[in-house]
Amino acid sequence: RDSRIAPTRLLAAAAAAAEDGPRTFISASAVGFYGFDRGDTKLTEDSSRGDGFLADVVGDWEAATAPATDAGLRVATVRTGIVQAAAGGTLRLLRPLFSAGLGGRVASGKQWLSWIGLDDLLDIYYRALYDDRLSGPVNAVGPEPVRNSEYTSELARVLHRPAVLPVPSLGPRLVL
């Protein structure tokens, strides 16, 4: 919690106090803002904050940009989904499990998963920095979410491995 909120607040205050300093403040954020599971509701940047620990942390994280906003800087908070990259992101964690034949859906598999490729995420940060039209929350996700069961089936297909062992719903909550 504090590893995200305190540094963001300090950086926002420093940017706000700098004479001839930046006119833009970009902060990382997360789609965890929307909560763990909102069912089939389509979520946009205008959607309300969800419930739960992660939603509370992300809400406080975004609120930590207030010094920059109050000083008149253009502030964008990039709400990032699950990052996909060949050598990192979520795949770095999941590939060994799936390669060992231990991969599978989480709980029912019906949860929506909003993801983004690393190159697209970098492009969003670049645009947030230089495009004056971007301010406030910016969802850094692909155009359509997928169900967890679809994601795990596709990952298993690409890796030529089975996806038969479901992960209990408690597993991801312990990690987060």
Give the ranges of each region predicted by the language model:
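NAD(P)-cofactor binding segment of oxidoreductase domains
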Residues: 1-25
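Catalytic helix-loop patch of NAD(P)-dependent Rossmann-fold dehydrogenases
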Residues: 2, 38-77
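Conserved catalytic-site region of short-chain dehydrogenase/reductase
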Residues: 27-42, 49, 83-88
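Glycine-rich "substrate-gating" loop/helix at the edge of Rossmann-like oxidoreductase active sites
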Residues: 49-54, 81-87, 108-118
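Glycine/proline-rich active-site loop of Rossmann-fold NAD(P)-dependent oxidoreductases
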Residues: 59, 71, 84-93, 128-138
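Alpha-helical substrate-binding/gating segment
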Residues: 66, 95-103, 111-145
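Mid/C-terminal beta-alpha module of Rossmann-like enzyme folds, strongest
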Residues: 124-175
